[in-house]
Amino acid sequence: MNRYQETFKRLSCLKEGCFIPFVVLGDPSLETSIKIIETLIKSGADALEIGIPFSDPLADGPTVQKSNLRALSKNNTFFEYFKILKQLRKKNKKLPIGILIYANLVYNQGIDNFYFQCFNSGLDSVLIADVPIEESKIFYNIANKYKINPIFICPPDADADFLYKISLYAQGFIYVLSRPGVTGIKNNTIALPRDFINKIKKYNSVPLLQGFGISNPKQIKEAISSGLSGVICGSAIINIIEKYLNQEKKMIKEIKKFTHLLKLSTKLE
């Protein structure tokens, strides 16, 4: 079994959902970013989704866009990013670690070289946010060559044809969107209908995780009670980073408290 399979199996035995925080690597700096990630792990993260900074993150709302720009302003290199990811893996042998990236960055590295670097850094998965399933074959094939799980996004209004396609390609988990649009906290983030969740499960047994707008315990309890395996939370954590940009100790303290609260919410009673 790979790390995702082992993690989901362990959490299922514990009657817990999977909590995956998302942050952008290098925001607000590489040094602080490492402290944030270490805090997330110590405070209960079951896996990590780490964004590689990009200048035009189309799938992301204002909060994550600003996070990308803050990280890019430091002029860090791909070499530095992968060095940190490799260090994270050395310290966390069993933790699933995935990255979210945009296609231009993959092309700039060379597709094969990019996935080799992922493999060499001990990564488990790659989600290319702006590559639809229909255009994913070349990435999918090379990801498999290096034993990297390709992660795909499933919109809440997906039809049967799409669900069938995603069932053919999905590995690790499926990222099910709370709503169409971009990332961010909105008042209209609602629980996914149980019949929609059951429909996806008919096509694929890969765990389903809900993302986009997850920001409080109630949403997490609803997601897991409806049959999902867990949640991904990004903007709510990045809001804390932005709020305390000039108060690192306070930032870390608030992230620790928030992460602990959300992880507790994944436990089925």
From Swiss-Prot:
Which reactions are catalysed by this chain?
Answer: (1S,2R)-1-C-(indol-3-yl)glycerol 3-phosphate + L-serine = D-glyceraldehyde 3-phosphate + L-tryptophan + H2O
Its organism's taxonomic lineage begins at:
Bacteria, Pseudomonadati, Pseudomonadota, Gammaproteobacteria, Enterobacterales
Q: Look up keyword NADP and say if it applies.
A: no
An example Pfam family from this entry, by short name, is: Trp_syntA
The alphabetized UniProt keywords are: Amino-acid biosynthesis, Aromatic amino acid biosynthesis, Lyase, Tryptophan biosynthesis
Q: Where are the transmembrane segments?
A: none
Q: What is this protein called?
A: Tryptophan synthase alpha chain
Recorded GO MF terms = tryptophan synthase activity
Family as reported in the entry's similarity comment: Belongs to the TrpA family.
Q: Where is the active site?
A: E49 (proton acceptor), D60 (proton acceptor)
NCBIfam families attached to this UniProt entry: trpA
Main EC class of this protein?
Answer: lyase
According to its UniProt entry, this protein's organism is Buchnera aphidicola subsp. Acyrthosiphon pisum (strain APS)
The Gene Ontology CC terms held by the record are: cytosol
| E.C. numbers | 4.2.1.20
> From what superkingdom does this record's organism come?
Bacteria
